[in-house]
From Swiss-Prot:
Histidine kinase domain mapped to chain residues: 133-349
Organism field: Bacillus subtilis (strain 168)
Residue intervals passing through the bilayer: 12-32, 43-63
Class of the enzyme per the UniProt entry, highest EC level: transferase
Name under which the protein is recorded: Sensor histidine kinase YvcQ
Extracellular domain ranges by topology: 33-42
Pfam families on file: HATPase_c, HisKA
Single biological process term from Gene Ontology: phosphorelay signal transduction system
Subcellular location: Cell membrane
Keyword terms: ATP-binding, Cell membrane, Kinase, Membrane, Nucleotide-binding, Phosphoprotein, Transferase, Transmembrane, Transmembrane helix, Two-component regulatory system
Main subcellular location of this protein, as a coarse class: membrane
Length: 356
């Protein structure tokens, strides 16, 4: 410990000795210049007195810091984390301003470590919960497909076209579930997966509507797309944004009144430096008490209790993706009258691309 202490202050010691030597030289030259004979005793006194005071000062400083430095060394050898060290140092009063700064920094690092560890643990728990829910939801299409195959083998199934249609429905559920699971896994490495680009928003939306065309026809819902006369170019990641809009369209399809010919209105508008994409349905709406929580992970609310396909992850993932792309996503709804989901793109988009 003493060796380390002296090595850390070697520069100060050397410059102090150099200063004493310089003082002796100046005194010697002054005496010689005056014509007197320098006394060895006086010269030694000039050397010994400052040297003794310097040594005494370092000794006092070492004694003052010894207990704290010994304690820190012991903590460094035994503590399991930086937060353990930080908590322990809080109970040990620093002796110097430098020690106080180091203690403050270690405490800050410990808090940062705990925060990141807690975030990681929550992500793992969330991933585990979602995986369990996903497996549970996927059991239904597996069971249905198995039953359909058995009926086909026994010759008790309905007509072949109906059989294929039912099989396609279950396959669609599989596709949607697998896509959500894949995007959940990719979200953890979002910053490495995102690819900013400029593209036509209306063309992307038309493509997604065509992709869900069969669902619109089956549920007797009619999409209408309203776009400005000029092409609307936005900067974003098209793959991730497509996932977000697909989730919003899927929710609009799922929670609209089925088979009555209601419209689902998709509207693109530009206002100054902002572009808005809204998807409005005339479905069952969201209860007021549930609206503030619809973007929380695993929250299904009152409507989720009546919808077997609800996982509580679709809108959560959509919100997370929009936040990381620098877009805003919010919902407006009136129970029994429908819901409007809106994405806002601003001129400073893609400025918050970070990992979860």
């Amino acid at each position: 410990m003493l060796k380390t202490y002296l090595i850390d202050r070697l520069a100060i010691i050397l410059f102090s000795l150099l200063g004493i030597g310089s003082a002796m030289l100046i005194a010697y030259l002054s005496i010689v210049e005056s014509g007197a004979e320098p006394s060895k005793e006086n010269m030694m006194y000039i050397w010994i007195l400052p040297g003794t005071l310097l040594a005494a000062g370092f000794a006092a400083d070492y004694v003052r810091q010894f207990s704290f430095l010994t304690y820190v060394k012991k903590l460094a050898e035994q503590a399991s984390s930086s937060n353990d060290i930080g908590q322990s140092l809080k109970a040990r009063k620093p002796r110097t301003g430098e020690q106080a700064l180091w203690t403050k920094m270690i405490n800050a690092l410990g808090q940062q470590y705990e925060s990141r560890l807690s975030q990681y643990i929550n992500q793992q728990k969330q991933h585990y919960t979602f995986t369990n829910q996903w497996v549970h939801h996927m059991k239904t299409p597996v069971s249905v497909i198995s039953l359909m195959i058995q009926e086909g083998k026994n010759g008790t199934s309905s007509s072949f076209p109906t059989f294929l249609e039912e099989l396609e429905d279950e396959n669609e559920r599989f596709r949607h579930g697998l896509d959500m699971m894949l995007q959940t896994a990719r979200l953890e490495e979002f910053a490495f997966d995102v690819k900013p680009q400029t593209f036509d928003l209306a063309e992307m939306v038309r493509s997604l509507i065509n992709q869900e065309k069969r669902q619109f026809i089956k549920r007797r819902l009619f999409p209408t797309l309203h776009v400005p006369p000029n092409a609307v170019q936005i900067s974003s990641d098209q793959k991730w944004l497509s996932f977000v809009v697909e989730q919003i369209l899927f929710n609009a399809l799922k929670y609209s009144k089925q088979g009555v010919g209601d419209p689902i209105t998709i509207r693109i508008e530009t206002q100054g430096h902002e572009t808005r994409l809204s998807v409005a349905d005339e479905g069952i709406g969201i209860p007021p008490q549930d609206l503030p929580r619809i973007f929380d992970a695993f929250f299904t609310g009152e409507n989720g209790r009546t919808m077997k396909e609800a996982t509580g992850m679709g809108l959560y993932l959509a919100k997370q993706v929009c936040s990381r792309l620098g877009h805003k996503l919010y919902a407006e709804s009136k129970e029994g009258a429908g819901t409007v989901m809106t994405i806002v793109f601003s001129s400073d988009t893609l400025v918050n691309v970070t990992a979860l």
